[in-house]
Regions:
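Cytosolic, long alpha-helical scaffolding segments
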Residues: 1-222
Length: 222
């Protein structure tokens, strides 16, 4: 195999590893939402324990990127792909972390929130939007689809709206009954993590735009 063909093969393997990691992070978020919906503390614990797998995948991808950079002197297009992978891997890892963060809250949350709690239902609906953003961002990354990436960025407005609406509901809840502060704070942390997951999906989408254009947040890089 020629040096160029080997290099192309290594780049494709890097992309495959990145997509697989994204799928694992998305699954962790989906499972966290399901555990929240069903008050399943055992499932929540499994999510926390499974976070190491995503962390290990991050280290593997970072190693692949550094190997590609050290073994070759990539031209602009290749360098954009490697640089994007090094940035995106951090956002994906944080998505997995936030799924684990939510899972850690669930055992206490289910003791202070009744089944069918409307604020929890709103948080789950918000989370499903953030989860869909992950799927769409990873699809955009796989296809290097700038238009799809733009849709992910736009979708974040709905997640932010939900975050502010639920936060307002929780503030009213505390004002009406200060004894509910723990229950409110637990859910506030959950929606904050969900909001951050949406932000990380946006970051992935913005790096997709960079791969296609060489511009990141409207600034030319290379």
């Amino acid at each position: 195999m020629s040096i160029r063909k080997q290099y192309d093969s290594d780049l494709e393997a890097l992309k495959t590893a990145l997509v697989e990691m994204g799928q694992n992070a998305a699954e962790a978020v989906e499972n966290a939402l399901e555990a929240l919906c069903t008050a399943d503390t055992a499932a929540a614990q499994k999510i926390v324990q499974g976070d190491d797998r995503i962390n290990n995948m991050e280290r593997d991808i970072e190693h692949r990127c550094m190997t590609l950079l050290l073994r070759q002197q990539p031209v602009a297009g290749d360098l954009r792909h490697i640089s994007t992978a090094m940035k995106v891997v951090t956002d994906i890892e944080r998505m997995g972390d936030h799924a684990s963060d939510i899972a850690e809250i669930i055992p206490h949350l289910v003791t202070v929130r009744k089944e069918g709690d409307p604020a929890v239902s709103q948080a789950i609906a918000m989370g499903r939007k953030a989860y869909q953003m992950i799927l769409d961002a990873m699809d955009a990354l796989t296809a290097e689809d700038e238009i799809a990436a733009r849709r992910v960025i736009t979708a974040d407005d709905a997640v932010d709206y939900d975050f502010n609406a639920i936060k307002h509901t929780l503030a009213q809840e505390i004002a009406a009954d200060p004894a509910k502060v723990d229950a409110a704070l637990d859910l506030l942390m959950v929606i904050k993590y969900l909001e951050r997951i949406g932000d990380h999906a946006v970051n992935v989408a913005e790096w997709v735009q960079f791969v296609r254009t060489g511009r990141y947040k409207d600034e030319s890089m290379f």
